[in-house]
């Protein structure tokens, strides 16, 4: 089968690499460097199994800047382009996605078009009605950013927002990306599938907020947070997954789903979800105070290869520290490619903040501030 994938991010690449063992896959997107890298076999995907996977499997995959060329002869179209959030942070902006759907619908009449990234609840049904596109489906992805290929090749479950033969066909194609069978497949309505995506992300956001608050209590009252978490997670109903505290949630999809649900169901009486974002704000404020208690002259923000958005926790902490008069430096380079710059950064800072502790920081562990309890 010839499959066109609109998108060049980790979701698109995870799908493409998994499907390209059995299908002809063409990716498209407006990023020349990524297109060139993909065509050179240098896939911009940070997945630990990537090198071994490429060595073991023959893949039929290429990329192009020309969307028309990518869609030519396509028997299935996947759209894996993440949505931007509105300037006021209230909800998703769908205009760009709508134009991509319309373009694919015009170029590939009758061909199944599958939306993979999070969309507003009710969006797929609205687009189906507007375009008369009965073959437009929603099939949410649940890939981890650093393990997208691994999750594609070993899915625990697949959800497709169509309960008919078309939904079963799309599920079979997505299942073909797996290296082994066994994934549970659920066919459901489009809006229900959209809701599953957002509620699952909201649960993860609430879980992150819970363990961050546990850590905040421990910080404030002199408790050993790791010991408390280890004890709490012995209960099998809680489990040992996703329990490592962090500085906070940024503008990524987890808190966005929570905000979207708050907006969509704002008139429904609720207490848990509306407080998740507020919990994140409180977490940032506490961490800023704890850092300032150490009275460092120069504070470093260690964010290798990172591009912090306006709502990223490292950015928010940096802003909070600067507002209190602290001198803040940031390292966003490639630690392995520029060791001299990293060494200079370490030497210049009295305290270094890091979301996660990496080997690059082991030599200055005494002056690293992190809430990574499982490093």
What does each model-identified segment do?
Residues 1-375:
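Structural/interface elements that position substrates and couple domains in central-metabolism enzymes
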